[in-house]
Amino acid sequence: MKPVSLAKYIQKSPFLTKLLLPISNAYVHLSGYRKYGLRYDDLMLEENDDTQKALSRLPKMESYDRVYRIRRAMQLSIENKILPKSEWTKPEEDYHYLRPVLAEVIAERKEREAFDALIVKKPETQAHATSSPAHAH
């Protein structure tokens, strides 16, 4: 069963968006990943095959920056420190750089699976449908 998501419904409604945006911003702030200089997409698990393929499609500089942010965050976590507030990830810097690529990879995989499951049947022709005179006795 596919999980239910209200995100699209909320985004279509200006009232709900305005109502829930402060809650969303508070949640992002409390999650704390920006205090370590991370972006939201940095938190995606790499163990997934689709994510691995999406990561391999990132531009070199974006991939390098991602690894740097993760290593710096791990070092800060080991030292029980956070970045100075001036170095926290700002909301305008926290854009989705991996999610669009991942969506493309997943769509390609689903399309490939659909074609792999496709059964090709040879259509019967009229010549095969009627018995040939050689077999009629």
Swiss-Prot record:
SUPFAM superfamilies in the record: 14 kDa protein of cytochrome bc1 complex (Ubiquinol-cytochrome c reductase) (SSF81524)
Pfam families per UniProt: UCR_14kD (PF02271)
Record key words, sorted: Electron transport, Membrane, Mitochondrion, Mitochondrion inner membrane, Respiratory chain, Transport
Keyword S-adenosyl-L-methionine: no
Membrane topology of the entry: Peripheral membrane protein
GO aspect biological process, one term: proton transmembrane transport
Keyword match tRNA processing: no
Subunit structure: Component of the ubiquinol-cytochrome c oxidoreductase (cytochrome b-c1 complex, complex III, CIII), a multisubunit enzyme composed of 3 respiratory subunits cytochrome b, cytochrome c1 and Rieske protein, 2 core protein subunits, and additional low-molecular weight protein subunits. The complex exists as an obligatory dimer and forms supercomplexes (SCs) in the inner mitochondrial membrane with cytochrome c oxidase (complex IV, CIV).
Family as reported in the entry's similarity comment: Belongs to the UQCRB/QCR7 family.
Function: Component of the ubiquinol-cytochrome c oxidoreductase, a multisubunit transmembrane complex that is part of the mitochondrial electron transport chain which drives oxidative phosphorylation.
Protein name per its UniProtKB record: Cytochrome b-c1 complex subunit 7
Naturally occurring in which organism (per UniProt): Schizosaccharomyces pombe (strain 972 / ATCC 24843)
